[in-house]
Structures are given as C-alpha cells and as structure tokens.
C-alpha cells in the first residue's frame, strides 16, 4: 500500500518510476519507488505494525498459512487497512511544519523531483520525523 502511495506521487510528478539510484534497475521493477519507500518503512509501517501487535490488534490466530506463505485473514486485513489509513491521515512533524503522513510523502517526492529538475542534490533533505 505504501508502494502504491509513493508510485502515485512519482507518476503525478512526471518522474520515471523505473529509474532509481539505490535499487537495481530491472525489467518490471519500479526502482525509484523502492528507493523512495526506504525512508518511510520504519517510521510509518514498522512503527504502525509494532504498535498493532503491542495493542493486540493483530494476534497469532489472525494469520493464515498455506504453501505460498503467511497471510492476514479477512478480519485482520480490515483492521490493518483501517489502521494504515488512519496513520496516513495523522499529523507528524515534517521538518519545520506539521503535515499528515500522506502530505509528508508528497512533499518528500517533490523534493526528489526538484533535485532531478535542477540537478542539485542539496535540494533533497533526508527524512526527519519527530
């Protein structure tokens, strides 16, 4: 879901999602999206999932396994989606201002686009959420 959030911002900004810098360019893999997702994985997804487990929102019986892997059951998927959307709407301190996580992602993608447009790496500031 975070992947799709970033992909939509990359496309809206007219960036080429398959040309990245950290992830290997491979046919069918949007390397730029993978690059941009790295900053958000821990502060957004990892922290959310850990909080869900700590609050017993996700329990062992909500997981189903089969020969292809381990998956959330329908009840758990609904809880996860609701929590994810709530997290994206929640505020965070993004540099000097308060934004929702969704707006912060958009801002960070814009900063990356500015670097490309102006060929100036100093326009990109690494993510610092407080």
Which residues make up each language-model segment?
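N-terminal intrinsically disordered, cationic/polar leader segments
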Residues: 1-130
